[in-house]
């Protein structure tokens, strides 16, 4: 078993512990096996998550005042309530999707693991390790921000415990899925590099066949399975992104903290959503599949013509490649690549402006009511 496969097994182990992909890895046959015990574990874990998220959503809906932060304005408290409920809904949806399509996910991941075994590289191995280290560091930062921020803001004990539990668990689950998706894309990129090297060496038939298999998998199962997951995850991160800056504007910059607390709260608010945004940017910037696929066409244009049937095959491939765009999408709503980053940051800035406008309207209403 290659060293890269061992690194990918870290993701599989973490996903198994969190009840998302409960399989055992057979290293001899590079096969994922679902046992009766793992199936029971998946059912029980998913059931607990569905019950817990539903209970949290209902509690927040029936008792919104319990989650109010005294130093925050009405707009901010409403926004925080929306984020909490949305997080519960997204966790609910993710576990429903993963359990309902567990057999499709198993076949997909197993196929990519076998591709990884054939096309392993030390560069990809380092990327897997770096992703895991980054995931751990951002989890610690996220935990520290939430604990310190909500404690200093004066949130009551019960809602504080609920917010910590829901948000930290959501970060662990959703960002692990983002990291795993990034790693799968890196495996497929390594596969395309491998087959492009075969093309350079003159092995056209094998190289083109392998390349088409990867792109078919990318545009088919990978797109459908993970595109559906990425849609609610990206939407949630987009919703959460303005919360830190808005809290900073509404409390710290308006002097609602003591002078000795301002600096630490300024730092906490500034980095509040940083872990989520780093994960999202990493997922969207990992775009090696499209880059390597485009390299194939450039290589084939340099192949000398021989006057045989191979020339016609290359010409057909190039014509097809002009129409084919191996871009991963969130179920067709937007592309999961670097082109989406600018649109997302524009949307975040727009949401931020809207929130600030509502805050100003609230302050104006309070001023009028005083007279």
Curated annotation (Swiss-Prot):
User: Where can this protein be found?
Assistant: Cell membrane
The way this protein sits in the membrane is described as:
Multi-pass membrane protein
* Any one cellular-component term (Gene Ontology): axon
One Gene Ontology term from the biological process aspect of the record: signal transduction
Q: Which residues are glycosylated?
A: 73, 363
| Chief place where the protein resides | membrane
Q: Which InterPro entries match?
A: 7TM_chemorcpt
Stretches assigned to the Extracellular side: 63-80, 149-161, 250-263, 362-371
Instruction: Report what the protein is called.
Output: Gustatory and pheromone receptor 39a, isoform A
């Amino acid at each position: 078993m290659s060293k890269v496969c061992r690194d990918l097994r870290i993701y599989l182990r973490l996903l198994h512990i969190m009840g998302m992909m409960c399989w055992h890895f057979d290293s001899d046959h590079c096969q994922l096996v679902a046992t009766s015990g793992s199936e029971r574990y998946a059912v029980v874990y998913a059931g607990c998550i569905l019950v817990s998220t539903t209970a949290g959503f209902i509690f927040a809906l029936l008792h919104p005042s319990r989650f109010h932060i005294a130093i925050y304005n009405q707009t901010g408290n409403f926004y925080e309530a929306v984020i909490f409920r949305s997080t519960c809904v997204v966790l609910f949806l993710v576990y429903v999707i993963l359990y309902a399509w567990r057999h499709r996910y198993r076949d997909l991941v197993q196929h990519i693991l076998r591709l990884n075994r054939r096309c392993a590289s030390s560069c990809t191995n380092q990327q897997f390790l770096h992703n895991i280290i980054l995931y751990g560091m951002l989890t610690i930062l996220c935990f520290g921000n939430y604990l310190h921020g909500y404690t200093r803001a004066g949130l009551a004990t019960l809602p504080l415990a609920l917010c910590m539990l829901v948000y930290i668990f959501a970060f662990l689950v959703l960002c692990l899925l983002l990291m795993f998706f990034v790693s799968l894309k890196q495996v497929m990129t390594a596969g395309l590099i491998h087959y492009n090297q075969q093309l350079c060496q003159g092995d056209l038939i094998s190289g083109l066949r392998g390349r088409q298999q990867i792109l078919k998998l990318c545009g088919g199962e990978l797109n459908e399975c993970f595109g559906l997951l990425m849609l609610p995850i990206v939407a949630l991160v987009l919703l959460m992104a303005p919360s830190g800056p808005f809290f900073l504007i509404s409390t710290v910059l308006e002097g609602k903290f003591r002078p000795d607390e301002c600096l630490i709260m300024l730092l906490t608010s500034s980095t509040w959503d940083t872990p989520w945004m780093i994960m999202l940017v990493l997922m969207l910037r990992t775009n090696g599949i499209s880059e390597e696929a485009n390299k194939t066409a450039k290589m084939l244009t340099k192949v000398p013509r021989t006057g045989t049937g191979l020339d016609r095959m290359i010409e057909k491939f190039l014509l097809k490649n002009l129409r084919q765009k191996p871009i991963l999408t969130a179920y067709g709503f937007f592309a999961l690549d670097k082109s989406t980053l600018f649109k997302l940051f524009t949307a975040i800035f727009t949401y931020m402006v809207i929130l600030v406008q509502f805050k100003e309207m609230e302050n104006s209403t309070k001023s009028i009511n005083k007279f």
